[in-house]
């Protein structure tokens, strides 16, 4: 039951982020399962949600040999969308 509730929160958060991204002209797809949701934005840009926060990969730490992630509270989907949109723009420039 807890997984269903947290999964529902994750999906609702992801859909709110998707809507805010759409207002910024950034298309995306939402997928959910196993208590999590993800917003697929661009090649190499997937935003995960657990219903409490969003997180996405922003780079690679060569020293620690691992990805670097940014995160944002899911209570602020508009601000998170602006940050994701900036990342999207930087990836498209490559």
How should these model regions be labeled?
Residues 67-94:
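Ampiphathic alpha-helical segments that act as solvent-exposed interaction surfaces
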């Amino acid at each position: 039951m807890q997984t269903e509730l947290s999964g529902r929160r994750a999906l609702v958060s992801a859909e709110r982020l998707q809507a805010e991204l759409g207002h910024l002209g950034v298309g995306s797809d939402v997928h959910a399962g196993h208590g999590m949701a993800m917003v697929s934005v661009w090649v190499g840009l997937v935003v995960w949600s657990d219903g409490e926060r969003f997180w996405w990969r922003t780079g690679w730490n060569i020293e620690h040999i691992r990805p670097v992630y940014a995160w944002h509270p899911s209570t602020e989907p508009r601000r998170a969308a602006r940050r994701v949109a900036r990342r999207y723009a930087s990836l498209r420039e490559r």
